[in-house]
Amino acid sequence: SKPGEMEKLERIIRPTIGVITYIGHEHDENFDSLDQKREEKMKLFAHTDIVIEDATHQNVRTCAAVMRALGYDEEIITERILHQTHETVMEVNLTALVDNVRYFRNLLKPKTKLTCMVKAFAYGAGSVEVSKALQQSGLVDYLAVAVADEGVELRRAGITLPIIIMDPEVAAMDIILENNLEPNVYSHQSLKTVIAAAEAKGLENYPIHIKIDSGMHRLGFYQEDMPWLIARLKAHKAVRVQSVFSHLAGSDEAQFDAFTKEQIHYFDACAETLKKGLNTPILKHICNSAGIERFTKYQFDMCRLGIGMYGFSFNGAQLRNVCTLKTTILSVKTVKAGETIGYGRHT
């Protein structure tokens, strides 16, 4: 459960056969990284004759590579519990990801906050692993996911950063509140729902985030909704507005720069109306990854970083590659000129 324990245990029991079936996230707080945890576990098998590993589990498969790197005999590393194996894997370099976050962080003013998007399994990179790396980096103020279940998973994994739920479902509102997750409010009905849920639990000043529709036309309030919104929020003390935000539709393309600025100005007007009407400090944020690079002057109080974490720059910056897809070539064949391959016989 902490560094140094396996060597002591190995000297006591001197196992001759080792079996690895699972390595999870228990006791993660005692290790600097998952790699350090794997290395610690492998020290138990320093003098074993054979190690049997469950090749269906990614962490366990990685242990074999760790053992080779530590100088273990290739012959003792076997894969005996084979029910299902995958020869195509995606490797995620969390150090590179944090370096990319640091690049975007450095484009912002010291007091500007940063939200990182970890929705959809962190775009396939592993929401728990990515979130832990971000939390440990100290570079991030908020995380954001799409639905409540994603936020609950992060809470259970030990993530303590504030988490915004971008698409909160009505049926999940109790779960959101119970797990200290912060819902996006984007319509009259969504505000009524979160107020009712918070009041039912006897809560006061529960943080919510107000979405403004500045031109993307998916979710959000308009300028004409501000009087109703202000009146409703003043009448109910169960919730308080933590931030007001919007989404840019084309911040990554120069051809849409004029529209992007229109969005920003419309959003700013709505946000200022809301702040003055409620007479309270509220964080404002509209810039995404491209916006951070291309519209830095409009960083307001916070920015949201998503695809930029994975090495995508919209200014040509040399960011680090984070994800690598690896596979095994099944076959190499020589085909005569003019012959076709696969269905359709198209050339």
Range-by-range predicted roles:
Residues 13-25, 55-82:
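A conserved, hydrophobic alpha-helical segment in the catalytic core
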Residues 9, 21, 37, 59, ...:
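Residue-level signal for inorganic ion chemistry
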Residues 25-31, 85-87, 251-255:
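A short acidic, helix-capping loop that chelates divalent metal ions and anchors anionic groups
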Residues 82-109:
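Positively charged, low-complexity intrinsically disordered leader regions
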Residues 89-91, 112-283, 299:
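Active-site-proximal beta-alpha core segment in soluble small-molecule metabolic enzymes
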Residues 1-54:
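Flexible active-site lid/hinge loop adjacent to a nucleotide/diphosphate
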Residues 257-347:
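Anionic-ligand-binding alpha/beta catalytic cores of soluble enzymes and soluble regulatory domains
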